[in-house]
Amino acid sequence: MPFDARTRPLTAPQARVLATLLEKSRTVPDSYPLTLNSLLAGCNQKSSRDPVMQLTESEVQQALDELRQQTLVLEIGGARVARWEHNFTRGVGVPDQSAALLGLLMLRGPQTAGELRINAERWHRFADISSVEAFLDELQSRSDDKGGPLVTLLPRAPGAREPRWAHLLCGPVDASLAQMASASPASRSEEDGALAQRVQALEDEVAALRATVQRLCEQLGVAEH
């Protein structure tokens, strides 16, 4: 049975954990699947996150356990340290392109189709805005037997040129609160978006280096400092 957010919506920690696994599988594939520590750092990073969260290790572990019950994440064995990967595309029943858009909406909040195309650059390269809109329309028109719509188009906020899209994985969206968030100046211009991408790229490089060190420590049987 496909995932149905109408009957069992994700909690905020679950959405952050799931979206972070989606992101890292695409941006730092050499470090993926993720250890609990790497996942915690990704969930709480300050760039490319809206809102910024401060989850604890126990909260992330609880979210993983709950997501595993829904077969949305998988624990990978065979290593000294447990690693985790998402099972989003199969568990929710969407293609990779749609998974990228949903992951971005979970991590960054409501966005226009144009913002999604820019922010998805390191996840999936959409040919143009029309291709983004085509996948969004498909997600919005999902039939009830497939779990119902997964995104909604919000009313255009006062002063905004374009309406924003929001995900429904955590249940119905309060349009008034979403409009208030979209009215804030943080990270909405193209220049800010480009800067955020550069910061994200640097953070991903650091994460990849840490993962390499951790793997070497596991192979050598020494503790990481």
Curated annotation (Swiss-Prot):
It comes from the Bacteria. InterPro entries: DUF480 (IPR007432), WH-like_DNA-bd_sf (IPR036388), WH_DNA-bd_sf (IPR036390). It holds the Pfam family DUF480. Belongs to the UPF0502 family. PANTHER family: UPF0502 PROTEIN YCEH (PTHR38768:SF1). This is UPF0502 protein Ajs_3392. It comes from Acidovorax sp. (strain JS42).
